[in-house]
């Protein structure tokens, strides 16, 4: 189980990403369309003034049960350990053990 502080930090990042998504997209579009170098530099500065944790690249997928950041399955939102355990218990509809 991940530390609660790490899980909360990731939740805070998610909130910041959602809060600043429109502003960030707008600035990036302005940057793309700007032709003057001084304008581009100013827009880039505005982008850099946004909170660091509002960048989507800082988001880390975590298991919603354990908070584990590695071995994450996007389809389920679970780590490999929980996925295996729940699949064996039959808690995941449609998931069956492979056999050939």
Curated annotation (Swiss-Prot):
Record GO terms (molecular function): rRNA binding; structural constituent of ribosome
SUPFAM superfamilies per the UniProt record, alphabetical: Glucocorticoid receptor-like (DNA-binding domain)
Keyword Ribonucleoprotein: yes
Leader sequence residues: none
The keyword Ribosomal protein is assigned to this record: yes
Source superkingdom: Bacteria
GO biological process: translation
Database matches in InterPro entries: Ribosomal_uS14 (IPR001209), Ribosomal_uS14_bac/plastid (IPR023036), Ribosomal_uS14_CS (IPR018271)
Keywords assigned: Ribonucleoprotein, Ribosomal protein, RNA-binding, rRNA-binding
Database matches in HAMAP family: Ribosomal_uS14_1
The protein's assembly and partners: Part of the 30S ribosomal subunit. Contacts proteins S3 and S10.
Family, similarity comment: Belongs to the universal ribosomal protein uS14 family.
Job of this protein: Binds 16S rRNA, required for the assembly of 30S particles and may also be responsible for determining the conformation of the 16S rRNA at the A site.
Protein name: Small ribosomal subunit protein uS14
The gene coding this protein: rpsN
